Amino acid sequence: MAHHDPIGLIAPNAGLAQLNERSREIFRQIVESYLATGEPVGSRNISRLITVPLSPASVRNVMSDLEQLGLIYAPHTSAGRLPTELGLRFFVDALMQVGDLTEPERQSIQAQLASVGRAQSVEAALGEALTRLSGLTRAAAVVLTAKSNARLKHIEFVRLEPERALVVLVSEDGQVENRVLTLAAGVPSSALIEASNFLNARIRGRTLAEARLELETALSQDRAELDQLTQKVISAGIASWSGGANDDRQLIVRGHANLLEDLHALDDLERVRLLFDDLETKRGVIDLLGRAESAEGVRIFIGSENKLFSLSGSSTIIAPYSDGAGHIVGVLGVIGPTRLNYARVIPMVDYAARVVSQMLGG
């Protein structure tokens, strides 16, 4: 089911394949302890966990060998060990057993999509799928999808600061798009209201492209009726829509808050802050997810295997989904810390992609 061939992965050491059963079990315990707690684990605890009776000294000898192979390392001055990114990759590819979803988990994903109903947009359904996936995995869920030609319903300008405003675009199918707009100095609130009224009178029922053409024409004809500051607000608003006009794909993210749970140290908080910064770099995320559009099944990127998340030490598990004709039309998945529960998250992402494909197939 899962496809583990990330771009940029350094080939594992040939010695990994030669690990004996004892070494594999000790390594497995180190990884599983890390995935469960995020903390380093020492030889004394490992000797209690493994099925083969070994003294802590014997376990330390094996751990030394694992460290030389690049599978584990000692963080700071800790006596315990953590898996490296190479170690996590080896665990996912060679040792991990991917489980099946429970029936309640399957039903939860299906029910969340079914609750949207056919009257809602594809984006709304994908948003619901992400909300459920994010809740089940306790990570951030993402989807890359084609932009729709939804018809506009309403626009509003919300002042954030004296020279910055939020442009809120609402479409007839319930989509909401926000853009931050830089205002000219001295723009009063009355100009924002007048600009909103001018735009709302002309955009309703039109696509973004249609509205842009209509507004450019109307603005040139009605300049005498509008003061200069209002004209500038309207022109800036139109320009902010044009900013994404050449990109035919959109990124939806749900569950940022999940990444703030279970933080163990300031280092964890710093990694999450870096991940938030990465997620704001939408072009980078879109390019990353786009890699899965030509793949079959689930793709897994661990830490620096993907340059975008190399600083935050994050993992990405993604899968493509298809339309009724079997064409891949988007990608969904989760982004979280490298200690994701891979055995549980991989089948969830795979199943969510299959359910979305079935929904789009009618």
From Swiss-Prot:
Give the UniProt record's GO annotations in the biological process aspect: negative regulation of DNA-templated transcription
Disulfide bond entries? none
User: Short name of one Pfam family for this protein?
Assistant: HrcA
Q: Which InterPro entries match?
A: GAF-like_dom_sf, HrcA, HrcA_C, WH-like_DNA-bd_sf, WH_DNA-bd_sf, WHTH_transcript_rep_HrcA_IDD
One of the entry's Gene Ontology molecular-function terms is:
DNA binding
User: Among its keywords, does the record have Transcription regulation?
Assistant: yes
**Keyword entries, A-Z:** Repressor, Stress response, Transcription, Transcription regulation
- Using the record, list the residue span of the signal peptide; answer none if the entry has no such feature: none
Keyword Cell inner membrane, does the record have it? no
**Could you tell me which PANTHER family the record lists for this protein?**
HEAT-INDUCIBLE TRANSCRIPTION REPRESSOR HRCA
Give the function comment from the record: Negative regulator of class I heat shock genes (grpE-dnaK-dnaJ and groELS operons). Prevents heat-shock induction of these operons.
Which protein family is named in the record? Answer: Belongs to the HrcA family.
What is this protein called in UniProt? Answer: Heat-inducible transcription repressor HrcA
